[in-house]
């Protein structure tokens, strides 16, 4: 390996992220294209169900119910596709970072049979992180009317402030907890372990680097926002100029913009987090030495160390 694995700073991880993305653009964009394509299909189907002149059936209750069910199924398919693409991207990063070759098909093929496991990892991480915040919001929704009814305007105002602060604190706690599980998918994919074990591995590996992970999420969020609006603004202008009276055509323009933005920006955060995973294994488990001891190229990456069990 011409570039041995070594500990990297946040700046070096970001630099390596963009180098890998730029040098393997077709690979990463090709993997990332699946979820935006699924969402585009969902948006176009939904647009086709919007009431238009000459199509009164679009306003019937049965048609609306069918559209709602179709929309939910489409969103579910999109989320599953997003999880699978995330896993395939992780494998692709492991290959190119360790100077091996791979393709779009091979990256998806290597995670075949682990789709359900990856989805369950993501669901577990989300529930562990944000379920408390959701419960706080539900309690707030129940208490607000009671406070307004029993305490007058002053009591309602005070209750609103307290409940609002509780929701904010719960949301912040959820985000902090989510940082603990940011490396669960790389652990699941590259070490071929169960969802619960991947969650535990992420807690161990992310310890001491959660500030770094937060910075990466924050910067990648900004990049995604900018890329999205670079496509959305022209699409909205084009729709306003040419798609008057045609919701389907307007949805096509905005859907294509979202498709392009998702394909281009989607893989970047996953690349960065995969590199954080490698960095933490180098720091905590001397992963560079383990790798040099591997017998042949293509050998599965060495798994969890006993030290990570806690």
Which residues does each PLM region occupy?
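Mid-bilayer segments of alpha-helical transmembrane spans in multi-pass integral membrane proteins
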Residues: 41, 76-88, 92, 96, ...
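Short, Lys/Arg-rich, polar N-terminal cytosolic tail immediately upstream
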Residues: 1-14
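Juxtamembrane transition segments at transmembrane-helix termini in multipass membrane proteins
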Residues: 4, 53-54, 58, 81, ...
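Generic N-terminal helix/loop capping motif
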Residues: 20, 24, 28, 36, ...
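Membrane-helix interface segments in multi-pass membrane proteins
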Residues: 39-78, 133-174, 225-266
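Short, surface-exposed, polar/charged, turn-prone segments marking secondary-structure boundaries
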Residues: 16, 21, 48-49, 56-57, ...
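Generic hydrophobic, aliphatic-rich segments that mediate packing or membrane embedding
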Residues: 13, 65-76, 85-92, 100-104, ...
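Interfacial aromatic "cap" segments that immediately flank transmembrane helices
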Residues: 11-38, 102-133, 163, 176-230
